[in-house]
C-alpha cells in the first residue's frame, strides 16, 4: 500500500511578535514560539491522521537566535524525509525581511500499519 500524504492548505504563515508574547527584555518567549511550531506541525498531520500516528515518535528543537517585539516572522514546513514507514517534517521559523533563522524543529511520525 502506498502512503499518500495530503499537503495542508498552506505551507507557511506569518506573524508579528506582539507585547503579550515577549519578556521584559522584549524577546519572544520560547514557549510561545514552541506552541506556534507545534500547532503548525499539527496542521500538517491532522489531514493525514488516517495514515499517520499523530503523536511524534521523535522531536528535536533548535533555537538559533532570539526574536524581538514587532519583528515579522515566517513559519514554514517541509517534508525532510519520506519513506514507506516514516515521515520527518521540518518546521523553520525565520525573520521575514532578513531570512535569518530563529529556530528549526523536526518531528518524526510513523505510518499506521495497514489493517
Residue ranges, per PLM feature:
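HotDog/MaoC-like acyl-thioester-processing domains
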Residues: 3-4, 67-69, 79-115
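Broad hydrophobic/π-residue packing in well-ordered secondary structure
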Residues: 19-21, 33-36, 63-64, 69, ...
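Hydrophobic beta-strand-centered segment that forms part of the acyl-chain substrate-binding groove
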Residues: 41-79, 85, 103-106
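Generic secondary-structure boundary/loop-capping signal
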Residues: 19, 58-60, 99
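Residues in well-ordered beta-strands of folded domains
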Residues: 16, 62, 108-110
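Hot-dog-fold acyl-thioester-processing enzymes
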Residues: 2-55, 114-115
Amino acid at each position: 500500500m502506498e502512503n499518500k500524504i495530503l499537503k495542508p492548505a498552506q505551507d507557511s504563515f506569518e506573524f508579528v511578535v506582539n507585547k503579550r508574547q515577549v519578556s521584559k527584555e522584549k524577546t519572544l518567549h520560547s514557549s510561545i514560539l514552541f506552541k506556534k511550531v507545534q500547532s503548525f506541525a499539527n496542521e500538517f498531520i491532522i489531514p493525514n491522521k488516517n495514515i499517520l500516528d499523530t503523536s511524534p515518535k521523535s522531536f528535536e528543537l533548535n533555537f538559533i537566535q532570539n526574536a524581538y517585539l514587532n519583528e515579522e516572522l515566517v513559519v514554514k514546513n517541509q517534508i525532510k524525509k519520506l519513506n514507506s514507514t516514516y515521515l520527518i517534517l521540518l518546521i523553520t521559523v525565520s525573520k521575514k525581511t532578513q531570512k535569518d533563522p530563529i529556530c528549526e524543529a523536526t518531528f518524526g511520525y510513523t505510518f499506521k500499519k495497514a489493517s
